[in-house]
């Protein structure tokens, strides 16, 4: 979804600035959008030499509450999840130049099947995910990787499976990426210097326990 249908440039800039401030608060290191990051004292899982996650963003600053109420985000989640959704977690992937997830691209599905064989899938709208791009997404810049049609397989990929079919999800800063939880997704390694930032809002059915401990 293009930036003009998501939020104003002013909101985007404020969100980016807020995420960088939280990076500093949690790592003890200064962050510059044009320079590679540092993990510092911060420890979170999953974590690589060129990426970490910021958790519990909803309570970190009022701007994330405003984002949760964004009309475009909510309209798309209502469509995908038939109005049954609740916020499960709000995080930010802080990524910089490096190998990232390696050759597998970290491909996975957010929706796990009800059986190991994947014959009886979970409901189509048990989970859906979204990525608000705070920087440009290109393959060289470490964009998301998705495997078209993989949501029809109703299972997790085997190690290395799907890499040859993965395509980059390229988008301008301010764009919103929305996807069903069943599609295999990960990310390409970032080849360029500087940060790739986002805010990921993950939604689940109200029958499921949320990832973040919301009350």
Question: Language-model features: where?
Answer:
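Extended serine/threonine-enriched, polar tracts that run as long, contiguous segments within proteins
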Residues: 165-185
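Catalytic core of non-heme Fe(II) oxygenases with the double-stranded beta-helix
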Residues: 75-76, 99-171, 208-214
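Non-heme Fe(II)-dependent double-stranded beta-helix
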Residues: 3-115
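Non-heme Fe(II)/2-oxoglutarate
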Residues: 28, 176, 183-184, 188-215
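A structural signal for short, well-ordered beta-strand segments
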Residues: 89-92, 130-132, 199-203
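Short hydrophobic-aromatic micro-motifs
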Residues: 2, 132, 177-179
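Active-site rim elements
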Residues: 61-66, 164-167, 186-188
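A short, structured loop/turn motif at beta-sheet edges
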Residues: 8-10, 172-175, 207
């Amino acid at each position: 979804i293009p930036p003009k249908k998501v939020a104003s440039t002013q909101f985007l800039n404020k969100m980016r600035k807020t995420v960088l401030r939280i990076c500093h608060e949690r790592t003890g290191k200064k962050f510059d959008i044009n320079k590679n990051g540092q993990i510092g004292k911060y420890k979170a899982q999953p974590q690589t030499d060129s990426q970490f996650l910021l958790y519990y963003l909803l309570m970190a600053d009022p701007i994330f509450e405003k984002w949760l109420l964004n009309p475009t985000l909510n309209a798309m989640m209502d469509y995908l999840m038939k109005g049954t959704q609740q916020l499960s977690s709000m995080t930010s992937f802080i990524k910089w130049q490096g190998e990232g997830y390696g050759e597998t691209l970290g491909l996975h599905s957010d929706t796990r099947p009800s059986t190991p064989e994947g014959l009886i899938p979970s409901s189509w709208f048990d989970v859906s995910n979204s990525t608000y791009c705070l920087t440009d997404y290109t393959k060289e810049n470490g964009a998301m990787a998705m495997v078209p049609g993989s949501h029809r397989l109703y299972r997790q990929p085997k190690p290395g499976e799907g890499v040859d079919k993965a395509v980059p999800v390229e988008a301008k800063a301010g764009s919103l990426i929305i996807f069903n939880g069943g599609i295999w997704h990960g990310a390409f390694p970032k080849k360029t210097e500087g940060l790739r930032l986002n805010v990921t809002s993950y939604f689940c059915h109200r029958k499921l326990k949320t990832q973040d401990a919301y009350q």
